[in-house]
């Protein structure tokens, strides 16, 4: 089934360090808009959300995390590159091991190379930079 025509369960990790949030950069060509999103991804059938978060961090940046507190669930109905989407998002606080902190991480997702970076939380709170879903702002 087309992932844009179903409700997709995902999990996102709120990883903070020195008032900075670990995010990956995204770009919507239709809106000509750059945005940021916390790391995480889809929850597979019969997979616990916190297990999916650990798997996603390992897949995305090659680092193990400690999943800390469950922060909440949010429903996200949005349009990305002209396509309507619907997500049910589980939020957790997450921590990397001290020795695994880097200024940026190279991400390779299915051949698409991107990077994860630490952005000052005030950039998002002051609306200088956009973080999606906006519910992230409640947890930072």
Feature-to-residue mapping (PLM):
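Conserved Nudix-box catalytic region and its N-terminal flanking loop in Nudix hydrolases
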Residues: 20-59
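Conserved N-terminal beta-strand and adjoining loop/helix that marks the start
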Residues: 1-22, 68
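A short coil-to-beta-strand element that immediately follows conserved catalytic motifs
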Residues: 64-73
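Active-site-adjacent beta-strand/loop module that shapes the phosphate/pyrophosphate-binding cleft
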Residues: 78-103
């Amino acid at each position: 089934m087309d992932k844009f025509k179903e409700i997709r369960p995902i999990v996102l990790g709120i990883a903070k360090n020195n008032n900075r949030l670990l995010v990956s950069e995204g770009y919507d060509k239709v809106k000509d808009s750059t945005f940021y999103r916390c790391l995480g991804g889809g929850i597979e059938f019969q997979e616990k959300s916190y297990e999916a978060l650990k798997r996603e961090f390992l897949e995305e940046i090659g680092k193990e995390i400690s999943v800390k507190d469950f922060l909440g669930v949010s429903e996200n109905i949005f349009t990305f590159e002209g396509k309507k989407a619907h997500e049910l998002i589980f939020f957790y606080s997450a921590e990397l091991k001290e020795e695994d902190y880097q200024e940026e991480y190279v991400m390779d997702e299915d051949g698409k190379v991107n990077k994860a970076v630490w952005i000052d939380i005030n950039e998002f709170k002051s609306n200088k930079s956009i973080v999606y879903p906006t519910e992230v702002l409640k947890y930072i």
